[in-house]
Design a protein with these regions (language model features):
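Short, Lys/Arg-rich, polar N-terminal cytosolic tail immediately upstream
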Residues: 1-23
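Cytoplasmic membrane-interface segments at the C-terminal ends of transmembrane helices
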Residues: 15-25, 82-98, 138-148
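N-terminal signal-anchor transmembrane alpha helix
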Residues: 22-46
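Hydrophobic alpha-helical transmembrane segments
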Residues: 26-34, 70-74, 98-103, 124-128
Length: 148
């Protein structure tokens, strides 16, 4: 009775990919950022139609929130998602941690617009925009995590 050596040998198995390929990471991030910008622009249009001024008091001088400001406001989300994806290559649980941190930062950032010296419509619209960007970050990281 002979023992098959191939059945008893131990082979090193390559570990599974920790995170999605970079192409997928970039696509998920860009799509989430673009979706956030479009939804925030819709919120801005709805707020303007409802009478929100989108004028904030910036140390005594008025600052008007424009459409380009909405685009620029998504850059922290893009950097955060890419950083979480990079860290997720090292440890997979960091993707989920990135989702939690992104969601919490969005919730905490709502305090800024709510405490701003401006009209109520502007406060509500800006707070909603902060939440939209947070949801986009969480969704992008979920798409990246599921692709892993």
């Amino acid at each position: 009775m002979s023992v098959d050596s191939s059945a008893t040998s131990t082979r090193s198995v390559r570990p599974a990919r920790v995170v999605a390929p970079w192409r997928h990471v970039l696509v998920a991030t860009v799509v989430a950022a673009a979706a956030a910008v479009v939804v925030c622009w819709v919120v801005m249009l709805a707020g303007t139609a409802a009478g929100a001024s989108f004028v904030l008091d910036d140390r005594g001088s008025p600052h008007v929130v424009r459409a380009v400001d909405v685009v620029l406001a998504t850059w922290p989300m893009v950097v955060g998602v890419l950083l979480a994806a990079l860290l997720g290559r090292w440890r997979a649980w960091l993707l989920r941690a990135g989702q939690v941190v992104g969601g919490l930062l969005a919730l905490l950032s709502v305090a800024g617009p709510m405490l701003a010296v401006t009209d109520s419509g502007t406060r509500i619209a800006l707070a909603l925009m902060h939440l939209v960007v947070g949801v986009a970050a969480v969704a992008a990281l979920e798409a990246i995590r599921r692709r892993a």
